[in-house]
Amino acid sequence: PPSWGIRIRSVLFFVIYNAVGIVHGLNCLLIGWFLPRDQRYRFVNIWTRFAMWLLGRLNGVRIRVEGREHLQDGPMVIIANHQSSWETFYLQLLISPQATVLKRELLWLPFFGWGLALLNPIRIDRGKGRAALKAVLEQGAERLKDGIPVVIYPEGSRQKPGTLGHFNHGGSLLACRNKVPVV
């Protein structure tokens, strides 16, 4: 079991992270809609940067990125494993702006969903397979034409660390149809 120090730091992170998230979510609701796209991404990601900083300071999380040279400016499809909330946050900082394919229910979450909606994600109803694929292909093509990278978690939901789920083909199909690289 985790030590008491780890437990206390984890609870402290959770409390601070959520308190700042509520305040920032309200600010996003009041200010974010009026900002141009690039400023909106930077504004929303203030909370993300804070969360990554807090993880490092409070919980000792260190980040090392290998292969950053493979990331380019402009349109591409990023296919990523989904093991926790962490990678969704960090990818927002690593590649911004971006359009993330996500389940629409995330946008219904108070505060968090309000900020997320400002990033113009590709919303899908995971219960409707064909309609979800159509949304990814159509909305993804629009974002790519605008020069915005698209992030897809092809397993559809979180997987246990070290395991791989079934990869849906929407990301590769989107990249092939739009002749953009896959990272």
Provide a role label for each language-model segment.
Residues 3-64, 114-118:
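A transmembrane-helix-recognition feature enriched in membrane-embedded lipid enzymes
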